[in-house]
Amino acid sequence: MIPNEKIKSIYLIAICGTGMASLAGLLQKSGYQVTGSDSNIYPPMSTLLQSSGIDIKPGYQRKNITQNIDQVVIGNAVSQDNQEVLAVQEKGIPYISFPEAINKFYLKNQKSLVVTGTHGKTTTTGLLSWVLHSAGKKPGFMVGGWMNNFDGNHAISKGDFFVSEGDEYDTAFFDKGPKFLHYNPFASILTGVEFDHADIYRDLEHVKDSFRNFVNIIHTDGFLLS
């Protein structure tokens, strides 16, 4: 994996998804040159990206993948036969998934606070971010919804904490494990577990297994609220 200090240009495939657009905003605020593509370009995410000066290329085209790209982030909805993915692989450009990118760029040297559960993640993540902000902790966060309090859905940490939503859905076409296993949780809020995502989980017990795996990687000095 390429060291962060050697990365200047980052390209996001499927940049207009809620999480990917938030990540793009974080990366740009961190000083990286950020571009990306999507086949579904529409508000509010397209407006957010364009207002930040991030170039969005419509559709997925091989010509978009150039050698000056240092790192590619591939969204969950992107398939293995995507034309840009094929170009990335042919050119040997390093690529990672969305949750891997969060870990790589924003969870190092931070206490990772992960809100997970079948329902209520976005609301709870927003509340936790606001509580920490109000307490003067200056947390980083990435939330799957727009927060009027912050006039945004992401922020770079200026303290010890980064708050994120832990999704049990699979990571990418090249990583079928749950996203939340990439977040190195120091502590977590678990809102509840129900059967969901019938396209990848057999039954409720299968879903519970994923959450058990997540709980088992919480830091030994951390905690779980449920």
Predicted regions and their residues:
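ATP-dependent carboxylate-amine ligase
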Residues: 1-45, 49-56, 68, 72, ...
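Phosphate-binding loop of NTP-binding sites
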Residues: 3, 26-29, 63-67, 76, ...
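N-terminal glycine-rich dinucleotide-binding loop that anchors FAD/FMN and/or NAD(P) in oxidoreductases
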Residues: 51-61, 160-163
